[in-house]
Swiss-Prot record:
This is Probable protein transport protein Sec61 subunit gamma. It comes from Neurospora crassa (strain ATCC 24698 / 74-OR23-1A / CBS 708.71 / DSM 1257 / FGSC 987). SUPFAM superfamilies: Preprotein translocase SecE subunit (SSF103456). Residues 1-39 are cytoplasmic. It comes from the Eukaryota. It is a single-pass membrane protein. Gene3D superfamilies: Preprotein translocase SecE subunit. The chain crosses the membrane at residues 40-58. It is found in: Endoplasmic reticulum membrane. Belongs to the SecE/SEC61-gamma family. GO terms for biological process: post-translational protein targeting to membrane, translocation. Keywords: Endoplasmic reticulum, Membrane, Protein transport, Translocation, Transmembrane, Transmembrane helix, Transport. Residues 59-70 are extracellular. Its main location: endoplasmic reticulum.
Length: 70
């Protein structure tokens, strides 16, 4: 019985230990790296927004033609 409880308690301890080791190895991005990542994310947002706009721009008239304005 005590072995089962010990096994149950070992899982969170190992998880916490691994998490602490991971955080200690991580480092914050420097200013240049942060700007580069921000530009990449911003470009992705713009491209996805443009694609969504174009799809909607084509879909609305096409839907009107197919449905017939019902």
């Amino acid at each position: 019985m005590a072995d089962q409880i010990q096994e149950i308690l070992d899982v969170p301890r190992e998880f916490l230990k691994d998490g602490i080791q991971f955080i200690k190895k991580c480092q914050k991005p420097d200013r240049r790296e942060f700007i580069k990542i921000s530009q990449a994310v911003g470009t992705g947002f713009l491209i996805m927004g443009a694609v969504g706009y174009l799809v909607k721009l084509i879909h609305i008239p096409l839907n009107q033609v197919l449905v017939g304005g019902a």
